[in-house]
Amino acid sequence: MKVGKPLGEYVSRKMFYGLKTGLNEAFVITSGQSQQIVAKSPASVSLVKPFLGGEDIRRYFIQDDGKLMIVIPCGWTKAEIAKTKKGSVSEKQAWEWLKQNHAGIAEHLESFEDALRKRQDQGDYFWELRPCNYYSSLDAPKIIFPDICKAPRFCVDRSGIYLANTAYCLGTDSLYLLGLLNSRLFWFAIANISIPFGTRAGEYRYRLIYQYMERVPVRTIDAKRAMDTVRHDRITQLVDQVLEAKKHLASARTERDKTFYESKCATLDRQIDKLVHELYGLTPEEIAIVEEAKQ
């Protein structure tokens, strides 16, 4: 797999770690808690984001259990107050402002105040998150994946989901790249680049941290080569079909429907794998090695 461009370069180094809150029990809330917060202060809806951990990210789909995250970036409070008041403010004044303008959030976080103040990871005030310069990348369309897994679990997110520090994201929603990442060949490459991180159910798990992922070669497409474009477009089409089939599988209520969509996904996977092998120019012998490797 020496053909292509390293993933880190391919995505312009746009690979980001999930957020470290220092106290998830304070910032990660249920949909019910979110409704209560927004009911008390409707403006707070902009500070509540959909949230996932690495364990929620599966292959081509997301197991969404309705978790949300209160996101108050470092420096946000001062910036908001400065819109209507000039000069510096004390923490007490800033807290009073938060209680007046975002009562639901202030009430919720106040119950965690002691623990929040003890965090190493915090912003200007105990209710803010630590400094982060890639919030816009979390809001944007992206490919997401867990930091540790025993098989490919890459998915696309186009709804602005925020991630825990058990997950990563790539700054692209390319379905072509998603198909490559979830292919047997890519997992074979990752398993040979990354270092095993213990086992689960008798299978090795691998760390998908930046220092390993950035090295995985992504096959670039030469527009002057007709077959490159054909394969790229076909992979994109097939991945789109997998994503749709996964949605149907998740909502299937009968065993017949589940079996149908599971079979459809497996067929699409095989077609994608075949195209990936062709793109990388694998020989029959090399394909056999990849196919025999555990997934």
Regions found by a protein language model. Give the residues of each.
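Non-catalytic DNA-recognition/assembly elements of restriction-modification systems
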Residues: 2-7, 104, 218-295
